[in-house]
Amino acid sequence: INDTNNFKKIMKAQKINSLTLKKKLTRSSDAHKGEFGHVLVIGGNIGFGGAGLLASRASVNCGAGLVSLATRSSHVSASLNFCPEVMVKPVDSGQALEKYLNSPSVICLGPGLGQDFWSEQMIYKSLEAAKKNNVPMLIDADGLNLLPKFIKKLPLPKKVYGHGWILSG
């Protein structure tokens, strides 16, 4: 993760217009949402609920077939009002998170995660499950801030991504 030169080599941006995007996003009439991946967003600690909501909505808008948000139980109602397409999971402990870690095709960890005990449980359980199930992870914000604490305790999943500007900082 700290090898920013290598990261910049694999990070390729491509300018697209609405016509190109429409062609890429075309789905057959008999397509099922299960064919387009399951994103699990983990975040939205107390006082930071909006970040998890925004990441979840972005996943829906990008075309993910299923999107789940694992967040504090105090954010469930607001989350469902904001984006009813998202399956909101009340998670107030690492143990509560475990049951949602077996089905995603990608885990997004960090939006509004914070840096308290709850945050540490979320990162520990998600790293453990991603490694075990060979699921790629996108780690953002406080997820990246907490990552060094866990690198020695847990092997990282094979595919871990983060924002280039955060990784280069």
Question: Which sequence ranges carry the predicted segments?
Answer:
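Small-residue (G/A/S/T)-rich helix-start motifs and N-terminal tracts that mark the onset
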Residues: 1-141, 145-169
